[in-house]
Design a protein with these regions (language model features):
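Interaction-mediating elements
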Residues: 21-146
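Bacterial Sec-dependent N-terminal signal peptides
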Residues: 1-23, 39
Length: 146
C-alpha cells in the first residue's frame, strides 16, 4: 500500500508541473474573435510566424502573435490587445489613442511610435528616437519615462 501511494505521488509530482505552465502553439483562427478582428484590421497583409497561447495551471492567460517584419502583438485572454511592438516600424495610428497621436506628432515630429503597451493605468509608448512616454488611460500625456 505504501509503495502504491509513493508511485502515485511520484506520478503527480511529475505531471503537475507540466500542466502548470504549458504554453501551446495554436492557429490564428483559434484566437479570440476580438484578436482576429484586430489583426485583420491593422495587420491584414502580414504573414503570421506563430501564435502562442500562454497558459498557467492549464488555463489560457494571454496570447502572443509574431508576424513577419519583427511585429509582436500580445492579447489578453479575452482578445484585447495589451502590447504592440513593431520593431523599428510605425505602430498603426488606429491602434493608438487619439491623445497619443496628437502629442507625438506635435512634440516629436521627427519620431513615430514603434511600441505601445496598455495596462490598467494607461499606456507606455516607445518612440523611434528611443524616448519612452507615459500616457493616462484617456490618452493624456503624463511624463517622459526614464
Amino acid at each position: 500500500m505504501k509503495k502504491i501511494f509513493m508511485i502515485i505521488a511520484a506520478m503527480m509530482w511529475a505531471v503537475v508541473p507540466m500542466l502548470a505552465d504549458e504554453d501551446r502553439m495554436i492557429d490564428r483562427e483559434d484566437l479570440p474573435k476580438k484578436a482576429q478582428v484586430f489583426l485583420n484590421e491593422y495587420f491584414a497583409n502580414a504573414e503570421v510566424v506563430y501564435v502562442k497561447a500562454d497558459r498557467e495551471m492549464g488555463v489560457v492567460t494571454s496570447y502572443d502573435v509574431v508576424l513577419m517584419g519583427d511585429v509582436k502583438v500580445e492579447f489578453s485572454r479575452g482578445g484585447e490587445w495589451t502590447s504592440v511592438d513593431c520593431g523599428l516600424d510605425r505602430v498603426p495610428d488606429g491602434v493608438l489613442p487619439q491623445g497619443v497621436v496628437k502629442y507625438v506628432s506635435s512634440k516629436f515630429a521627427n519620431a513615430h511610435v514603434v511600441e505601445i503597451e496598455r495596462n490598467k493605468f494607461g499606456y507606455d509608448v516607445k518612440l523611434s528616437n528611443d524616448i519612452d512616454l507615459d500616457f493616462g488611460i484617456n490618452g493624456n500625456f503624463l511624463r517622459i519615462d526614464d
